[in-house]
Each structure stands twice: as C-alpha cells, then as structure tokens.
C-alpha cells in the first residue's frame, strides 16, 4: 500500500511538472526578440549596447548605444559617446520639417551635438532628463526623447532640460541582424545608467559601460 501511494504521488508530481512546462511555452514563444542568457530572456530595450574589442565596423568601435526598441522588425538606438562638436542653432532648426521662422536672435547660439548612428543622419533626437516634457516627448527607462524645434529654443534660452544630448542620426538593425552580431561577440549588454549618459565625459562612457556589462552572448 505504501509503495502504491508513493507511485501515485510520483505520477501526480510528474503530471504537474509537464503541465507547468507546457503552460510557459506561450510565454517563451512571445519573446523571439529577447536574448537567452542561462535560463532568462533579456530584452536589449532599455539597456546599453556596448561594443566589444571584437567589433570590426570602425564606425562602432568603442561605442555605447542606448537601446530604445527591439521587435519583429528589428532594433534601434542612439550612440551617446561620439561628439561631433558645436554648431549654431540655425543648423539644427534648418534640418527640422516643422521649423518656424521665429526667435532668430537665438540662431547664432552654439550647441554641442553627437553622432547617433549612420541611419538618417539629418534626423535630430534630443535625449534628456525626465523633468522636461512637451507634446512630442516619449518616456523611456530613466530618460526621455523629444523631437521638435521648441526644445531647441528652450535649450538655447537655458529653459530646457537639466541634462541632455542632441543627437543626429540613429543606429538600426534589421530583423535578425543584431542577434547575429551578438552571437559573434561584437556587442555586450550593460545596465542603462543616466549618469553615464549625461554626466560622464564622452571618453569615459565606453570604459564605464563596459565595466558594468553583465551579459556576454
């Protein structure tokens, strides 16, 4: 009788494990754009994508990228440690489709800009701290992005966000492309840190982000 009860308990336990396994299959199937590390799926969104020493593309050597999305169409983000220099506000306003012929007295104010990646390098992204917002602001983990001329005027008048980067262009990957680059160790992931984004000197961002990396695929 004791052996029979033990077999019954074992049978029900195994049945429970099988049912539990199949119950999580839909969850695994819904995460094709996440990256398997051990037993956990990690999304690149809201992380730093950090170039390793194995990076072969000279444009991305020692880059740190804030990853803003990854889905079935691919992934994209903004490089944060490649300064271009300072340009007059006029240059930035002229690149915007919704530019307004106003506040021309501010056009000569020089503003530092960064290279965000090789895709659509005339597009402007203002990556900034979260206390500032307007109708075009999108919020992410610990940071925000605004993409209109109003924030540029606010920055020129010292009325903008406390911390910001003005970035031209972005970095993008087609479906499956980033996975392939990570599989050959061109990239690792690191926790997104707003202090590294806004407060570290550009030359220190890559060493800091690389030091904090936690996923090597």
State where each predicted segment sits.
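A short aromatic-anchored loop/beta-hairpin motif
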Residues: 28-167, 171-217
């Amino acid at each position: 009788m004791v052996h029979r009860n033990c077999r019954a308990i074992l049978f029900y336990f195994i049945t429970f494990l099988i049912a539990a396994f199949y119950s999580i299959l839909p969850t695994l199937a819904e995460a094709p754009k996440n990256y398997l590390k051990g037993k956990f799926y990690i999304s690149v969104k809201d992380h730093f994508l950090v170039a390793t020493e194995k990076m072969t593309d000279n444009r991305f050597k020692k880059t740190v990228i804030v990853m803003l999305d990854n889905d079935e169409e691919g992934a994209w983000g903004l490089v944060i440690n490649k300064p271009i220099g300072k340009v007059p506000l006029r240059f930035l306003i002229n690149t915007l489709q919704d530019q307004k012929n106003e506040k021309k007295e501010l056009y000569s104010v020089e503003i530092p800009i960064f290279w965000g990646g090789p895709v659509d390098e005339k597009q402007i992204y203002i990556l900034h701290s979260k206390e500032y917002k307007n109708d075009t602001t999108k919020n992410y983990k610990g940071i925000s992005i605004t993409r209109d001329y109003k924030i540029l005027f606010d920055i020129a008048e010292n009325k903008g966000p406390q911390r910001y980067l003005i970035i031209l262009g972005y970095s993008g990957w087609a479906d499956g492309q980033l996975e392939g680059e990570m599989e050959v160790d061109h990239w690792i992931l690191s926790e997104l840190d707003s202090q590294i984004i806004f407060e570290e000197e550009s030359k220190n961002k890559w060493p800091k982000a690389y030091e904090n990396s936690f996923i090597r695929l």
